[in-house]
Swiss-Prot record:
Lineage, uppermost ranks: Eukaryota, Metazoa, Chordata, Craniata, Vertebrata
Keyword rRNA-binding among UniProt keywords: no
GO biological process terms on file: acute-phase response
Keyword Cytoplasm: no
Assembly, per entry: Apolipoprotein of the HDL complex.
Residue numbers spanned by region Disordered: 88-122
Protein's UniProt name: Serum amyloid A-2 protein
Protein role: Major acute phase reactant.
InterPro entries in the cross-refs: Serum_amyloid_A, Synovial_Prolif_Regulator
Sections of the chain in a coiled coil: none
Disorder: Reactive, secondary amyloidosis is characterized by the extracellular accumulation in various tissues of the SAA2 protein. These deposits are highly insoluble and resistant to proteolysis; they disrupt tissue structure and compromise function.
Family according to the record: Belongs to the SAA family.
Amino acid sequence: MKLLTGLVFCSLVLSVSSRSFFSFLGEAFDGARDMWRAYSDMREANYIGSDKYFHARGNYDAAKRGPGGAWAAEVISNARENIQRLTGRGAEDSLADQAANKWGRSGRDPNHFRPAGLPEKY
């Protein structure tokens, strides 16, 4: 519901043309896929200390898609961190995750967070 409300707000208030609106939706969809791929890779790698790298990489890949991808990355990242905070995960770790998320969304190299020894596949 929040996604729909956000999209309606963007289209009405910002007077987005139908062409750019559908472009935004496509970017958001592709960005969400990038985030899912990073999450899946993180689970598959199961490598200690790599979570910040995968946070940054997912946000980086999504933001490269354009404004829709960056928006999707921010919404997904914030939702994930809020859910984890509610389930008792530490605030300090959540802040570090958010810093990695912002790093990636800003277009900076996610390899900054890459731990030594993480297989090249990732």
